[in-house]
């Protein structure tokens, strides 16, 4: 995060607004990926699931998203799903309008269909393509969004490749490096991000990493970032995987991001995973990146996390006098110092 962007985000928080918004713009997805948190029964925190929501299409979707952005004025909007490319016609209208508003947008997709070339001209847009490991495993998990189809559909773009590390991957030595060897040389790849699988509390799925596998993944990433410059993760961010936030109240990402589901009304809490995520096994790269920022000192004994706590408190007070604003989460807690 650049200094100017950080100051803008701080200003939003002090004004009682959240600087980031994540929108599940559709409930539809042609994939059926094992372990997908969006389709967990408790993702929305109640009896209704994502597939049961009434989502929007056409001009109603475009107007609904623009109304949210104009009302809440986030600096950054993540467009997720489902898969956003299910609504690619709406995005062809929406993305240029968001770009004109000065909003930075990230579209997270499986790239199961061609990404319109016109999107490559939008200065405030990132395309993040989800890829689950090497081709044999990925193609089995994410068909029809196979390697061959992805390579064809991202042609002419510079995308971010995002891989979620799973327990299955870490059972084979050298797996992450093989992944880097394939994707790093590709001209279509701008950078590569890695997260780790985040289960719900009590889940023991094949995707879950053991403590030893988690530490091995950290060690591998710290080594690989020196060999592959496209691995766009700093050492501080990678080390945070060893000490994730203890709860959403201690997670700067959760506290500063408003997440809405496909009806554009239902809030997803306590963070983008919804349900009851096991924070002790959190693998969210965005969370780790912001925690790395939170633990930096701005003065002896004063971390950015402490400043953020005070700012969130001020923002909550301010937001009470503006009914139309998004209320900052009332359960914000101190971002713990790390030694």
Predicted regions and their residues:
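Conserved alpha-helical substructure of the radical SAM core
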Residues: 1-118, 310
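Short, charged low-complexity linear segments at domain edges
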Residues: 1-18, 249-267
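Flexible mid-to-C-terminal extensions adjoining Fe-S/redox cofactors in radical SAM and related proteins
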Residues: 17-19, 248, 260-339
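Processing junctions and N-termini across compartments
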Residues: 23, 27-30, 245, 273-276
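Local cysteine-cluster metal-coordination motifs and their immediate loop/turn environment
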Residues: 28-40, 250, 277-286
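Residues that line or immediately flank small-molecule/substrate-binding pockets and catalytic motifs
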Residues: 40, 81, 131, 196, ...
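Radical SAM enzyme [4Fe-4S]-AdoMet core and its adjacent flexible, acidic
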Residues: 48-49, 70, 101, 123-254, ...
């Amino acid at each position: 995060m650049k200094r100017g962007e950080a100051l803008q985000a701080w200003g939003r928080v002090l004004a009682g607004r959240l600087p980031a918004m994540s929108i599940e713009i559709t409930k539809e997805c042609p994939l059926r990926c094992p372990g997908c948190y969006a389709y967990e029964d408790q993702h929305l925190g109640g009896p209704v699931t994502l597939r049961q929501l009434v989502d929007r299409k056409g001009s109603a979707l475009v107007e609904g998203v623009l109304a949210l952005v104009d009302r809440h004025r986030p600096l950054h909007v993540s467009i997720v799903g489902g898969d956003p490319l299910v609504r690619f016609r709406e995005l062809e209208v929406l993305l240029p309008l968001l770009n004109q508003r000065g909003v930075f947008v990230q579209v997270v997709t499986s790239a199961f269909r061609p990404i319109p070339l016109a999107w490559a001209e939008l200065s405030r847009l990132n395309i993040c393509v989800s890829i689950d490991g090497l081709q044999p495993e990925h193609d089995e998990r994410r068909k029809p969004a196979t390697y061959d189809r992805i390579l064809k559909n991202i042609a002419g773009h510079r995308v971010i490749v995002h891989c979620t590390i799973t327990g299955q991957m870490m059972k084979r030595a050298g797996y992450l490096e093989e992944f880097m060897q394939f994707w790093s040389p590709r001209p279509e790849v701008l950078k590569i991000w890695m997260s780790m699988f985040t289960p719900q509390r009590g889940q023991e799925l094949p995707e879950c990493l053991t403590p030893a596998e988690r530490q091995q993944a950290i060690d591998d990433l710290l080594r690989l970032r020196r060999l592959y410059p496209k691995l766009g993760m700093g050492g501080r961010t990678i080390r945070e995987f060893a000490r994730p936030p203890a709860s959403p109240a201690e997670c700067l990402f959760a506290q500063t991001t408003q997440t809405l589901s496909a009806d554009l009304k239902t809030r997803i809490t306590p963070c983008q995973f919804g349900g009851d995520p096991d924070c002790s096994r959190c693998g969210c790269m965005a969370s780790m990146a912001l925690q790395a920022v939170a633990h930096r000192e701005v003065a002896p004994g004063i971390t950015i996390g402490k400043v953020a706590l005070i700012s969130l408190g001020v923002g909550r007070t301010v937001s009470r006098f503006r009914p139309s604003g998004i209320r900052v989460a009332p359960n914000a807690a101190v971002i713990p110092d790390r030694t």
